[in-house]
Each structure stands twice: as C-alpha cells, then as structure tokens.
Amino acid sequence: GYQAKRRYYDDKSMYVHNPKPELSSAENFLRLIRSDKTYTRLEAETLDLALILHAEHGGGNNSSLTVHVVSSADTDTYSAMAAAVGSLKGRRHGGANIRVVEMMDDIKANVKDWSNENEISAYIRKIAEKQAFDKSGLVYGMGHAVYTISDPREVLLKAKAKELAKAKGCMEEFNLYDTIEKVAPGIIQDVHKSDKKVCANVDFY
C-alpha cells in the first residue's frame, strides 16, 4: 500500500523488498519502506514500542471490536485485519495522530520562536478558541476519556521520542512538543471553563 501511494500520489519510483523472517515486525517495516533498506536500532525500538503500546490496549477500542465482529462472520484472518486497519484509519480512532501532525505543522508555521512559551501559549489558545488551525477548538493529542493525570503510553513514547530526537538532531522540535504538553492542559481548562484534568495522550508524540 505504501509503495502504491508513493507511485500514484507522490509520483516517485516504486521498489519492493522482501521481508526477512528473522527480523522483528518493526525492523521489517522500516526495511520495506526505505530504498536502501537501512534503519538504526533506536528507530526500530521506537517503532516496536509504538506498535506494542497501540496493540489491543484492553480490547474494547473500535478496531479491536471490528476484528471481533468481522471474525464472527467466519471470514479469514487477512480480511479481519484489513477491516481493523480500515477502522484504525478513522479520524476518531488511529487517524487522530494524523491530526496531531497536521496541527503541529500549523503551529510550527505560525509560531516564530519555538522556545518562547508565551508565544506558543498564545497560539494554542487561538486553536482552543476556534480561531486557528481547523477551527474545531480541539488541541489534538490532548485529553483522554479515561486517563486524566497521565496516559502511561504517552509517558513511555515521550521518553523514546526524546532519545530519537537527540539522535536525529531534532531537540528544538521535541522541546516545542514538550512546551505544548506543559501549557495546553491549563489553556483547555480555562477556555472550556472546566476543572477536569487534561493530559497528553498516546497520539501526541
């Protein structure tokens, strides 16, 4: 699917590598999507962690339920997994992290000084007040139906993301995320006149 997207939407050359059974799912995934088939151990560890933290997570989410429903029709495993991926793509499920990326691109384009907490806070407030980005009033990557103090998955991903940012020379961008995580909960509470605790969720990093 990724190669078809590169070819037909990005107008780039298509290449196909065979997976290696001795590699992990994360290692194979990184190997398959890169022309030179190379990846670092840290990249593989980061993707592996993300895959593990997203897998099932209690069994009651939309994509897991989809697998149960489709499997009950006595279909094959591949069809059940394809249905689950279709569910996961939805904006109110796994597709939420795409909205985080889009929001962050917007923030990076509109906040001149990524180290200025006041400037960052002012723009996050504009987003929360439906004056910026998609004008939905949602600060994507913030809030969870169950987790309020912290999302344990986010805590683990943040630590690994920091390692990866250091290795890739992207600490300025990581610090921007860190600042948003710090200021957004209070802004959301203030804008919505709510005392409900808000924390970053698994989609943020």
Annotated model-derived regions:
Residues 1-205:
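Non-transmembrane, aqueous-exposed alpha-helical and coiled segments at domain scale
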